[in-house]
Amino acid sequence: GMEFLGWREVPTFPNVLGHKAVECMPYIMQGFVKKPADVEKGLPFDRRLYIARRVFEQSSDDTYVVSLSSRTIVYKGMFLVGQLRTFFADLQSEDYESAIAMVHSRFSTNTNPSWERAHPNRLMVHNGEINTIRGNADKMLAREENMESEHLKGQLHKVLPAISKTGSDTAMLDNT
């Protein structure tokens, strides 16, 4: 239900990264979606983008969408904080402006580091472990059959499962 405008290859400088980060570096692209005329800006449009993201992610096991939002662009990867600006050419441009930037410099302690597990996530960044994640994930899975949403009318099935069990504890929460 939304018009896809096209892809943009994100310009990067992999030579600033360590060997292991380059070895498992994903292909980094940005996709652009036109807001439908009948959808309001802000949260209504972001809900539609959420559905589109979940459908796209489920199309392939090796697809990870860093962000799909009308409000934010997320840059992340397996590198140190000081390498962020030197890795992404966009962040070196004077044309780029931001009201806020979140940076997290700690790698996961209970899972192997990977590009998709790097912080920040789509909506959050935190320093620690979510100790109740297994119980919460199991409860969400049990409730999926009876879930309803006035905001995702007739499209809730497209975003299920609500929690992907393949990510870190933070990724599970960030996916909802």
Per-segment meaning from a language model:
Residues 1-176:
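Conserved short alpha-helical segments that host acidic/polar catalytic motifs at enzyme active sites
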